[in-house]
């Protein structure tokens, strides 16, 4: 992992001259497209960019390669999936390791047997409400 830092710095060295030339331009030259003016976006969309297109491709390729290298580097540290098929298979502990005198019965929070049971509400027939065999 410590060897990755010099590699990344070496890969970023070609971007330094491009960044220094971009800072020499005035801000008006740098912003052709103003995002706070969305009505002029279509006019700006067709203008040629000051940033060379091959740099975008180079940065994209470097991004893909560095992410791939980083993921391949850290992948073996994860202990799941097919790297470690027994990662979730916890060993079964024997039940004899707890002495029987130390096992406490759970306290009953509510003792239902001692509580008086509420009486059921009286049943009212449908026929009594309507007045007969309607």
UniProtKB/Swiss-Prot annotation:
PTM annotation, UniProt: Phosphorylated on serine; O-glycosylated, but not N-glycosylated.
Q: How does it sit in the membrane?
A: Single-pass membrane protein
The listed locations are: Host membrane
Signal peptide per UniProt: 1-21
Tell me which UniProt keywords the record has, alphabetically: Early protein, Glycoprotein, Host membrane, Membrane, Phosphoprotein, Signal, Transmembrane, Transmembrane helix
Name the job this protein performs: Down-regulates the EGF receptor and prevents cytolysis by TNF.
What family does this chain come from, according to its entry? Belongs to the adenoviridae E3_14 family.
The protein's predominant localisation is host cell
Q: One GO biological process from the UniProt record?
A: regulation of signal transduction
Organism source for this protein?
Answer: Human adenovirus B serotype 3 (HAdV-3)
Query: Pfam families, per this entry?
Result: Adeno_E3_14_5
Q: Name one GO cellular component term.
A: host cell membrane
Q: Which residues cross the membrane?
A: 54-78
What protein name applies here?
A: Early E3B 14.5 kDa protein
